């Protein structure tokens, strides 16, 4: 299974449903739901850390390339006629560089996934109260409350 935001959203759409006829089972299912999404959170967190390191490596590689300090073989395959020395100009080239931009987008995507899963985990932590309130409401409607 590939981990992407869409698949997590689809998974949560199913898992977020509470079966009103089996509230006791829903209550017992809370720890496994928490474990499932916490495992996802940890996996994505580690993937983000790896992507951060890749971004640093790409930034260094592209800095070397734009400053003319990269391995000469690289310029044979992909010539770059300039040697950037100015800090501001270098920053502009790095920001506009496709490889560097893609690594930033990847990290932003992981951040979006992490925020989404954090919100899921908060809902799961509150699920006990939701189930308790549902039971109390059912008792009230039945004239027992």
Residue ranges and their predicted role:
Residues 1-145:
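Charge-rich amphipathic alpha-helical interaction elements
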């Amino acid at each position: 299974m590939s981990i992407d935001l869409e698949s997590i959203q689809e998974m949560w759409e199913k898992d977020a449903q509470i079966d009103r006829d089996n509230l006791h089972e829903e209550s017992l299912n809370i720890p496994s739901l928490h474990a499932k999404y916490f495992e996802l959170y940890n996996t994505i967190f580690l993937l983000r850390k790896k992507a951060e390191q890749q971004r640093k490596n790409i930034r260094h590689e592209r800095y070397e390339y734009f400053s003319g300090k990269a391995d000469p073989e690289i310029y044979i395959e992909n010539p770059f006629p300039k040697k950037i020395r100015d800090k501001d100009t270098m920053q502009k080239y790095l920001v506009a560089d496709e490889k560097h931009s893609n690594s930033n987008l990847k990290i932003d995507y992981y951040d979006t996934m992490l925020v989404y899963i954090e919100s899921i985990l908060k809902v799961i932590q509150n699920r006990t109260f939701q189930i308790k309130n549902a039971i109390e409401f059912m008792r009230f409607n039945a004239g027992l409350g």
